[in-house]
Amino acid sequence: MEINKFICSQGPKKNSCEDFWRMVLEQESCIIVSLTETDDEDQVCYEYWVKEEDYELAFGRYVVKTLEIIEESSFTRTRLRLTDVSSDTSREIHHFWYPHWSDYGNPTNPAEILNLISKVNQKRKEMKKTADSQPGPIVVHCSAGIGRTGTFCTIDNALSQLRKEQTVCLPQTVLKIQKSKI
């Protein structure tokens, strides 16, 4: 199990988007996985990025610009530019959005989740090879930050363990995750 691979978070609300982006920048995260719908009423998760290319949103001192949107078969991958205007620092963020997993539900197609996990890990591996420094933790969120988020991280860890050891014990995997606070 890779320690500090993930930051598990609730979906940002309108009043916490600036804090969310501050965390992403401070933790040097370059990948975000969103496992929830967004809504304008701010009940589930506020729309903290623009779903159209070449548009931007400002949250306090942070500006988020959408550079590219790539529609995959079951999720949307978006390249964003996050800029802290007070320090003029910026970072490219890869955002993976999978809104088809309902709260308190199961994924309708487990192969889609496995594909999403594979693509996220592929992007992280690619970034580790090309970056001057190691990318920070992957930020994973749903609405509350526990159910779908925890399941995503558990599946990722179980798959990693299965590849390395040819066996997996889910209860032990969950306990390790809880103890390490990945």
From Swiss-Prot:
In this protein, the active site sits at 142
Question: Per its UniProt record, what SMART domains does this chain match?
Answer: PTPc, PTPc_motif
- Does the keyword Ribosomal protein feature in the UniProt annotation? no
Catalysis: reaction(s): O-phospho-L-tyrosyl-[protein] + H2O = L-tyrosyl-[protein] + phosphate
Q: Which InterPro entries match?
A: Prot-tyrosine_phosphatase-like (IPR029021), Protein-Tyr_Phosphatase (IPR050348), PTP_cat (IPR000242), Tyr_Pase_AS (IPR016130), Tyr_Pase_cat (IPR003595), Tyr_Pase_dom (IPR000387)
Tyrosine-protein phosphatase domain: which residues? Answer: 1-182
Domain of life of the native organism:
Viruses
Coiled coil regions, renumbered to chain: none
GO MF terms listed in the record are: protein tyrosine phosphatase activity
Q: Which principal EC class is assigned to this enzyme? A: hydrolase
Look up the EC number in the record and give it: 3.1.3.48
Q: Which UniProt keywords apply?
A: Hydrolase, Protein phosphatase
**Residues spanning the membrane:** none
UniProt xrefs under Gene3D superfamilies: Protein tyrosine phosphatase superfamily
Pfam family name, one: Y_phosphatase
State the family it belongs to.
Belongs to the protein-tyrosine phosphatase family.
Q: What is this protein called?
A: Probable tyrosine phosphatase protein H4
> What's the encoding gene here?
H5
